[in-house]
Regions:
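A structural "domain/chain start" motif
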Residues: 1-80, 84-86, 189-193
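C-terminal/domain-edge helix-coil "capping" segments
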Residues: 74, 81-83, 89-96, 143-193
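Surface-exposed short loop/turn segments
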Residues: 5-21, 29-34, 38-40, 95, ...
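Short, solvent-exposed, polar/charged sequence segments at loop or secondary-structure edges
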Residues: 65-115
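A generic structural signal for ordered alpha-helices
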Residues: 58, 62, 66, 112-114, ...
Length: 193
């Protein structure tokens, strides 16, 4: 299982930045960090896992989400691996063995991209996203490879919340990331058949 903790984030503050800067460089507002306007708009945010009140509100949204994930031990890699194993156990004849046990093939799951995105320009709700590459090797031979993306437009992705919710409700964040990793696990196992 491989995943980078670098998150892709495109929320309302980035949409506003892109819209305002369209004539002079549309990409200005699309940086991963929230703008000062976006940060100020979210200044009512609370705290998580011992953070001082307002401390999360001062952070750009992506940094605040990563801070909550770290404090609450929410690991996309662990969630994805479990979602894949659960889906495999329900629908496949393949047997999963422990990491240190001998196997006739190895499956590598790699999170190519993950984060949060809007469904439309100025919505107040962002949805978790996940793009996973799965590959099965037997020795040096690749015998299967696929990728699956869960986007805000996926009908099963019902885990949209406001940035404020993701900042202040660790269980909503956990529920959203667990949900999309389970969706991804099911899709990947369907491709494996």
């Amino acid at each position: 299982m491989k995943w980078e903790k670098n998150m892709v984030y495109f929320g309302r503050e980035q949409a506003w930045g892109a819209a305002l800067g369209a004539g002079l460089g549309a990409g200005v507002g699309m940086a991963s960090g929230a703008s000062k306007v976006g940060t100020a708009a979210l200044s009512g945010a609370g705290f998580a896992a011992g953070m001082k009140v307002g401390q999360l509100a001062e952070m750009p949204t992506p940094v605040a989400i990563l801070t909550v994930m770290e404090a609450e031990k929410i690991d996309v890699g662990v969630l994805l691996k479990q979602g894949f194993i659960d889906a495999l156990g329900k629908t496949s004849t393949l047997k999963v063995v422990g990491d240190d046990e001998p196997a006739d093939a190895q499956i590598q799951l790699t999170v190519a991209e993950w984060g949060f995105r809007l469904t439309q320009g100025f919505s107040s709700v962002i949805y978790p996203t996940l793009n996973v590459v799965a590959q099965m090797n037997r020795g040096d031979e690749m015998i299967w490879r696929t990728s699956e993306a869960v986007t805000p437009f996926n009908g099963q992705n019902v885990y949209g919340y406001t940035p404020l919710t993701y900042r202040t409700d660790p269980e909503a964040l956990r529920r959203a990331l667990t949900g999309i990793t389970q969706i991804s696990g099911r899709y990947l196992v369907q491709e494996l058949k």
